[in-house]
Amino acid sequence: MAPRIEPQEIETYWNIFSTRTNGGQFLTGEMAAPVLKNSGLRDDQLERVWDLADVDNDGNLDFEEFCVAMRVIFDLLNGEYADVPKVLPDWLVPESKSHLVSANKAIRGQEPKMERVEDEEEEEGLKDGFDWYMSPEDKSRYEAVYREGRDMRGEINFEALSDLYNSLDVPDTDVRSAWNLINPNASQTINKDACLAFLHILNYRHEGYRIPRTVPASLRASFERNQIDYQVDNQAAKSRWATKADDETSTGRKAKFGDQYLTRLGRSGFTSKGTDFTTTKNSDAEWEEVRLKKQLQELEDKLARIEQGVEARKGGKRDSKPALVKRELEQLLDYKRKELRDLEEGKGKSRTGSNLKSVSEDLQTVREQVEGLESHLRSRQEVLEQLRREIEEEKISR
């Protein structure tokens, strides 16, 4: 199963992001610096993480890019990477920015070439004349099928439509041929535009037309930027889909494409599997917890190596230095474990913030009391001055 950002992580990242941006949509380098530097990574590593996450190169991080940066940092701290990766893994690329990543790869000459489907032996009884144009009715039907099989990232895999394949008059080899045609990179999932093209090919094959062997250049480009021009070369010619089907023909007697599948499926069968960037929680202790766990793992590894070394000295003179080091490491390990427990239970240092808040509230109360007393003192002094003036005036009048 491919890795992904879990909803709990997204919730934590969202609270950090929303707190730093005060409800804004972008995080500047100045805003992000305190959070990122708390990870303990070197500045040069953080710079590379920033460049990696800033997919659109606008100098800021939106929420999806911030999630990418945080996940890369956590993976570095947890030992998933020895150093900052040079490119983002495919599963970590935000859906909304996949076209930018593809464009950057194309500029660097890393874009996989579109494969041409090999010519196969022509099947008897199939017709030529495949048309890439989609009528509004067909497009609507394709979108309904897509909605029932997509995951939360808006992508769809081959097996998600297995029930549809069973309802069609299309051989399995042709189904896979159509899939390979619109998925030349052999990805596990495809986006909406590629899915609609895939369903369109299956529709034509279901109606007795041969599967095309190539995809027009305009459609290939559209797949990469997630925008598809369904009317290739802006041709306005009438499509055969604009005319009413003849129910007397063998093709017309077939069930309309996807009708059986959609009727049988129902919308209640939809389950989400992808990363959802809409859920939201916050914890400044995340970095500390990760660091403590990493230190614990390092200490346990050191202890294991020392114990192996001691065991290797069978019958030899026991060196007191490894034993002393082992005791010190065990004590440090116990201390770190206690710190981690206190952190998880909200005890010890983790309560410093709440104590400071209580002291701050007490100080504010004292300030208010002092201000009240000073105000009362001023009013009494004014009364005293008034009495003194009246006494002086009385003396003068006598």
From Swiss-Prot:
Biased composition (Polar residues): 351-363
Coiled-coil stretches: 279-398
The keyword Cytoplasm is assigned to this record: yes
Swiss-Prot/TrEMBL keywords: Actin-binding, Calcium, Cell membrane, Coiled coil, Cytoplasm, Cytoskeleton, Endocytosis, Endosome, Membrane, Metal-binding, Repeat
Binding of Ca(2+), residues: D54, D56, D58, N60, E65
PROSITE patterns: EF_HAND_1, EF_HAND_2, EH
Compartment(s) where it occurs, according to its Swiss-Prot or TrEMBL record: Cell membrane; Endosome membrane; Cytoplasm, Cytoskeleton, Actin patch
Superkingdom field: Eukaryota
Membrane protein topology class: Peripheral membrane protein
Pfam families: EH (PF12763), End3 (PF12761)
Role, per record: Component of the PAN1 actin cytoskeleton-regulatory complex required for the internalization of endosomes during actin-coupled endocytosis. The complex links the site of endocytosis to the cell membrane-associated actin cytoskeleton. Mediates uptake of external molecules and vacuolar degradation of plasma membrane proteins. Plays a role in the proper organization of the cell membrane-associated actin cytoskeleton and promotes its destabilization.
Subunit structure: Component of the PAN1 actin cytoskeleton-regulatory complex.
Family designation: Belongs to the END3 family.
Record's protein name: Actin cytoskeleton-regulatory complex protein END3
Gene: END3
